[in-house]
C-alpha cells in the first residue's frame, strides 16, 4: 500500500510530527511520494547513471553522511548517491528527522538485507564525509573532520525572477516553491525579482502553527518599527531595491 495509507506508516508519520513540530503529515507523504517517483523510478535511475562513466576498478569506501533535518527525508538523496556509487553509507541522522530516516533504513534492510547502509555509532571509522548544515555548522565540520575528504554544504537560498506575464498556474507553482515545508528547504524561494509596478497575490493556504507564530512576530515587529510591508494574511511581502543573502 502507499505510504500513509497503512497503520504502520501512519504511526510513523504521527511520531515524526511529534518529534519535529515543523513537519506536517501531508508534506511527509508528499516527500515520500517525490522520492519514490523522482529518485527510485527505474527509468530515471538508469537515465541518471547513464550520464556517468563508471571506472573499471572502483575501491569501495565508507562514507559518513551527516544529514540535515529541516525537511522530511532531506538526507535520502545523499544516501542513495553513496550506495549507488558502490560505497558503504554510514548515516548520522538529524534528531529532527530520525523517526522517518530510521523507518526508511529499516524498509531498505527488509528489501535488501545486504544493502551497505548503517546508522553511525560514533566509533566506526570512515574514509570521507558528506555533511549538510548551516554556515556555522560547516565551520564546526571543517574542524571536526579535518584531514578527511569532505563535501560540505552550508546555507543556500533560492530566488525567482518574474517578468509580469506569468499565468495563474505558474504563480500557484511559485507559491508551492515558496511556502511548502514552511519555507525551510534550501530550494524554497525566499527572494523574488519582479518588474516595477507588478503586485503579487497568492491564494491563502494553511500553514504550520510554528510558521504562523513567526509570521505574527515579524508582522508585529515591522508595525512597531514603522517598516512598510504587504500582508498576505499568512506571509509578508517586503519591497526592497537592494538585497542581501
Regions found by a protein language model. Give the residues of each.
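Conserved NAD(P)+-binding/catalytic subdomain of aldehyde/semialdehyde dehydrogenases
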Residues: 62, 111-198, 244
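Hydrophobic packing residues within well-ordered alpha-helices of enzyme cores
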Residues: 101-104, 141, 202-203
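N-terminal Rossmann-like NAD(P)+-binding subdomain of aldehyde/semialdehyde dehydrogenases
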Residues: 1-64, 245
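Donor nucleotide-activated moiety binding/catalytic core segment of transferases
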Residues: 49-67, 120-125, 135, 234-244
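NAD(P)-dependent aldehyde/semialdehyde dehydrogenase
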Residues: 172, 182-189, 193-245
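Short, solvent-exposed amphipathic alpha-helical segments in soluble enzyme
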Residues: 80-82, 146, 207
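Conserved small-residue-rich beta-alpha loop and adjacent elements
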Residues: 47-109
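Glycine-rich nucleotide phosphate-binding loop and flanking beta-alpha elements
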Residues: 46, 71, 136-138, 200
Amino acid at each position: 500500500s502507499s505510504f500513509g495509507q497503512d497503520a504502520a506508516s501512519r504511526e510513523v508519520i504521527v511520531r515524526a510530527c511529534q518529534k519535529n513540530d515543523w513537519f506536517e503529515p501531508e508534506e511527509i507523504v508528499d516527500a515520500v511520494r517525490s522520492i519514490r517517483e523522482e529518485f527510485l523510478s527505474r527509468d530515471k535511475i538508469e537515465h541518471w547513471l547513464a550520464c556517468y562513466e563508471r571506472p573499471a576498478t572502483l575501491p569501495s569506501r565508507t562514507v559518513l553522511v551527516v544529514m540535515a533535518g529541516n525537511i522530511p527525508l532531506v538526507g535520502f538523496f545523499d544516501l542513495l548517491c553513496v550506495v549507488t556509487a558502490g560505497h558503504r553509507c554510514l548515516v548520522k541522522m538529524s534528531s529532527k528527522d530520525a523517526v522517518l530516516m530510521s523507518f526508511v533504513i529499516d524498509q531498505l534492510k527488509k528489501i535488501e538485507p545486504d544493502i551497505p547502509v548503517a546508522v553511525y555509532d560514533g566509533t566506526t571509522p570512515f574514509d570521507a564525509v558528506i555533511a549538510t548544515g548551516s554556515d556555522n555548522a560547516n565551520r564546526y565540520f571543517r574542524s571536526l573532520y579535518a584531514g578527511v575528504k569532505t563535501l560540505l554544504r552550508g546555507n543556500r537560498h533560492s530566488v525567482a525572477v518574474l517578468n509580469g506575464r506569468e499565468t495563474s498556474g505558474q504563480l500557484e507553482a511559485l507559491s508551492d516553491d515558496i511556502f511548502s515545508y514552511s519555507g525551510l528547504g534550501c530550494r524554497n524561494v525566499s527572494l523574488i525579482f519582479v518588474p516595477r509596478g507588478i503586485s503579487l497575490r497568492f491564494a491563502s493556504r494553511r500553514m504550520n502553527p510554528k510558521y504562523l507564530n513567526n509570521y505574527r512576530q515579524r508582522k508585529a515587529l515591522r508595525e512597531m518599527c514603522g517598516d512598510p510591508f504587504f500582508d498576505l494574511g499568512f506571509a509578508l511581502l517586503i519591497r526592497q531595491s537592494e538585497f542581501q543573502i
